[in-house]
Design a protein with these regions (language model features):
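Anaerobic metallocofactor- and corrinoid-dependent redox/one-carbon enzyme cores
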Residues: 1-24, 31, 63-67, 94, ...
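Electropositive, gly/pro-rich neighborhoods at or near active sites that engage anionic ligands
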Residues: 3-171
Length: 498
């Protein structure tokens, strides 16, 4: 897939890309993110689309995905041998990996924005530039600027998606979300695609089927145009890595709109549906016409629980909160600033990122539990499930844990940090703010690169550092951006707060 995309990007140097060209680039990159597509057949279909578009551009016209008869035989023609990236010098491989993985994560954001009618030419152009960069023989000195440019463009991309989401669904508002599943038929929607959730809410209205979010879909409850649907009831379960246990024998249907899909177990395989770029062998896939009838019928057939089914977060809490995006937090900025000046708030932590199954991720639970009562925890992405059901109190009427949204809502955290720095007349790195990030997949890469591109320093990353980063590149990041590997909550809190 990556080799075909690099080949297409090279063609775009001599043939003007079309809107469809840009879309197929997004689709191809998005498809290769961890836990999106397990289906070799559909991967080849997308590769064929990429090669068809390449052939069409070379012939002077785009065919919008129609496959010329020679596509199968031409599949490898002019495509880059991607193994050259993995066989390169480890420092070159590391930097190209940062660019590639960063673009994959960014493509997910751009794809979601496109589904809501938003795109940005500078973002589209960078994907082609970045892909061509992967296929070129460049030095570390030549690659480093492109690594940081990936982060800069991702900030534009996150802003684009934020604008798309808030234009379509309103500015998120603080919302308490129950974790109990009410009796009766229900569908659990997971992933990140708010448009798919909206379409499902419309199609299930008045049909006696309740809708629950899962994983990164939790922040949907904060958007006014989604929360107005009375049958959007609550949130099911915890983070993605627990799905094989949490989904087993559940009498409801599951819809995956994006990652993270794990290998499906027999105990629930008959009730899992995919859509968009998500694909898994033998599962029913909802195509672009978005007729969710099979999902709805399965939910009605299963019938749901006969009595309300109590579920909790990993710490035993039965509700969580969301909706503290930049619009909400900046709306009470005067209260926050006054609380800082009065000494009621001594420090802010942004604790979030990707969750995973690796031992040691309880670090983030303990970090939040042990954080002093005069500190505020901003959080985002699925890493929040390690602690978002905790009740650690409030400061000045504001909860100490504020969920800012999905991973792409790192944009909200950046907006808040910049606004606070302006209010206090200092740089962002001089704020009483520390980032404590959990690491897993490609979306974490593009967010990390954005933080680096903005010049943010002195943050903590764990529970392990990226395995694909070479010692030399890691040393560069540590020396230039003062990135700390997490150690223990006690030691890190002491180092941060003194």
């Amino acid at each position: 897939m990556t080799g075909a995309l690099i080949g297409l990007a090279r063609v775009c140097l001599t043939a003007a890309p079309t809107a469809y060209t840009h879309r197929i680039v997004l689709e191809g990159l998005f498809t290769t993110i961890t836990n999106v597509n397990f289906n070799e057949e559909t991967m080849h279909v997308i590769i064929d689309k990429v090669n068809a578009e390449k052939a069409a551009l070379l012939s002077g016209k785009s065919v919008n995905g129609s496959l010329p008869s020679s596509t199968e035989t031409d599949r490898a023609a002019a495509n880059y041998e991607v193994q050259k990236i993995w066989q390169a010098d480890e420092d070159i491989r590391s930097l190209k990996s940062l660019i590639l993985f960063g673009m994959r994560g960014m493509a997910a954001y751009a794809y979601h924005a496109l589904m809501l009618g938003r795109s940005d030419q500078s973002v589209d152009d960078f994907f082609l530039k970045g892909l061509r960069t992967l296929g070129e023989d460049l030095t570390m000195e030549e690659l480093l600027p492109v690594v940081l440019e990936t982060g800069t463009v991702n900030l534009t991309c996150m802003e684009l998606l934020d604008r798309a989401n808030t234009t379509a669904y309103g500015t998120p508002v603080p919302t308490t979300v129950p974790l109990t599943i009410e009796k009766g038929p229900f569908i659990v929607v997971t992933g990140h695609d708010l448009k798919d959730l909206e379409l499902l809410l419309k199609q299930t209205e008045g049909k006696g089927v309740n809708i629950y979010t899962h994983g990164e879909m939790l922040p949907a409850h904060g958007y006014p145009e989604l929360k107005k649907y009375k049958h959007l009831k609550g949130n099911f379960g915890t983070a993605w890595q627990n799905q094989q246990k949490e989904f087993a024998n559940v009498p409801g249907a599951f819809l995956f709109t994006t990652n993270c899909l794990m290998p499906v177990r027999p105990s629930y395989a008959d009730r899992v549906f995919t859509t968009e770029v998500v694909s898994y062998p033998e599962l029913v896939h909802i195509d672009d016409n978005k007729d969710f009838t099979p999902v709805i019928e399965k939910a009605l057939e299963l019938g749901g629980y006969t009595e309300d089914h109590v579920m909790t977060g990993i710490n035993g809490g039965n509700t969580v909160m969301t909706g503290f995006a930049h619009g909400t937090v900046l709306g009470v900025a005067d209260k926050v600033i006054d609380a800082v000046k009065a000494g009621a708030i001594k420090h802010f932590f942004l604790v979030g990122g990707c969750d995973g199954a690796r031992p040691g991720r309880n670090y983030y639970t303990e970090f939040v539990k042990q954080s002093p009562a005069d500190t505020v925890i901003l959080t985002l992405a699925c890493g929040k499930y390690r602690f978002n059901d905790l009740d650690i109190g409030s400061i000045g009427g504001l909860p100490r844990i504020m969920d800012m949204g999905q991973c792409n809502d790192a944009y909200s955290a950046i907006k808040v940090a910049v606004a606070l720095s302006e209010a206090f007349g200092c740089g962002v790195n001089d704020l009483p703010l520390t980032l404590v990030l959990s690491w897993y997949e490609q979306k974490a890469v593009c967010i990390l690169l954005t933080l680096l591109a903005l010049g943010l320093k002195n943050f903590y990353l764990g529970p392990t550092l990226p395995a694909f980063v070479s010692p030399n590149v890691l040393n560069y990041l540590v020396e230039n951006f003062n990135i700390h590997p997490t150690s223990t909550p006690e030691a890190d809190l002491k180092a941060i707060l003194g």
